[in-house]
Amino acid sequence: NDLPAARKAVSRIVGRDTDALTAEGVTKAAVETVAENASDGVIAPLLYMLIGGAPLALTYKAINTMDSMLGYKNEKYLYFGRAAAKLDDVANYIPSRLAALLWVAAAAFTGNSAKGAWCIWRRDRRNHASPNSAQTESACAGALNVQLAGPAYYFGEYYPKPTIGDAVRPIEPEDIRRANRMMYAESLLALALGLVIRGIL
């Protein structure tokens, strides 16, 4: 109910300008962050841990953190930020797609729309400048039957980004909890899958 406080809180986890966000915009930003972090905060580290142990997982996190801090298309970080973003794109290419598929399964386990997650992922997974960011966001949008992404301001500059998903219904604060539940379910599925693979190998 406290929109200024919500804007301030979400500003700590997103790169876009939040000062003028509506309540719907704040909710969208939070849901998008949950979806994207399911990939680069959970699935990717687990995958790299499985492949190369702690050293590879830590290397991945260093690349991902560098992209988060510097990978914006503004004049100050244009060249260094571009290199960080490209490295992150390569590192997340496979994990993001695995995360999207696991999100579809997680949608089924949490009472959300697995069919919607699959269909919107297939349709909108390329609706982003990054080859990876829309992977889990599209699965999340489809699972919730809401529309994510769209135009946003970064450092005062307007970016006409495409939308992801269909606005079957308006997004609401409860969708943040729904997205979190799917992220937790996806994490458990990934952990179980990793343990099975580890046991086989």
Predicted regions and their residues:
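Hydrophobic alpha-helical transmembrane segments
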Residues: 1-59, 63, 71-201
